[in-house]
Amino acid sequence: MEPIPFINHSWSYQGIDGAASSEELRQARVVLQNELQELLSASLSPIEWYQTVNELHDRIYRKAVELCIQGMVEEGFGQPPVPYAFIVFGSSGREEATLWSDQDNGMIISDNPHEGKEEYFAQLGGRMADMLEELGYAKCEGKVMCSEPLWRKTLESWKEQLRSWRSDLAWEPVRNLIIASDMRFVAGEKGLADEWIAAFYDGFRAVPELSDAVLRNTVKHKATLNILGQVVTERFGEHAGGFDVKYGLYIPLVNSARFLALQHGIKETSTLKRIQRLVSLEAVPLTLLDAAGRAFMIALKFRRSTPVVIRGGLQQSSGFLDEKQMKQKQMHYELRDTLGQVRRVHRALQRQLRFAERRRP
């Protein structure tokens, strides 16, 4: 696979950097989003497009943190009493968020003693979730947000939480560990995030059974090709005749690359970077990684091709290719071929799981 280029386009983020309120920040997001989607999409590769979109999100997150703290200072709460880190998970953690992605975030708070720090950061976390919602980032249905105590903790409490999840290999704790594995630092004190990452990977290596537990989670996803090799579309509802790009194509590849990365101690969060590191380590057959990498590039393209609607000046998408798109021969052929590559990767992981299950006492 070709190395991922670093793109630094020259348009101005002045509207974000100079925003003095959530209203101004939302308007800056609308302006830059429209410029990105309408003027630049045709000239940017999928990788360039996602890099630029995620740089936009990161700048908005950092400004939102600044505005929330400014509001707390003005209301008498003061500056943060101890260092903290604002972190993201999900597609933002993997730097694969679309223009319409929702919230997936958390917070790490320093262990430095201060009597009022829990109350302060509970207030800040709640304000952040509310402001991001005002800015067009829907609140996470799974409540993975810094407003929730489960995802807003002191560093030591985070370490205890990670230990707790590692000690219980049931579906929910393993799912939370999988979510946590995509963590990426955005704002605040980076050293807290670095220490969190070290604790996560040290702990993961210390529990060999975790790898199989993650694999069991990884191989579960919706069927996308029938026994004749035809694409399985939605049969009923508003998306009838359409195809679920997120859960039918994108997420299975994300999950596969994540599992292989965790198995081999790779700390990258970007799916493509995980695949590239696996290639460099020669940890997995090259033909399998090549299939996964090519399929993932198509998945990125299809994710940004799903129909969008404009609400309040901001784009929203269901994540489905619609029936009209599915009737386009070239798109349908490309999707079917890519899903064949996904099935190939999936079957390889299923074989690995069967082998692991046979080894269990």
Which sequence ranges carry the predicted segments?
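Hydrophobic packing residues in well-ordered alpha-helices of helical domains and bundles
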Residues: 25, 29, 50, 54, ...
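Alpha-helix N-cap/helix-initiation motif
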Residues: 46, 50, 114-121, 245
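N-terminal regions immediately upstream of nucleotidyltransferase
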Residues: 1-72
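Core structural elements
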Residues: 26-29, 83, 90-93, 217-229
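Active-site nucleotide-donor binding segment shared across nucleotidyl transfer reactions
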Residues: 57, 61-117, 122-124, 129
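Conserved NTP/Mg2+-binding pocket subregion across the NTase superfamily
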Residues: 123-248, 252
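Conserved nucleotidyltransferase catalytic core and NTase-mimicking acidic/glycine-rich helix/loop elements
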Residues: 202-361
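Generic, well-ordered alpha-helical scaffold segments in large soluble proteins
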Residues: 60-67, 71, 127, 131-135, ...
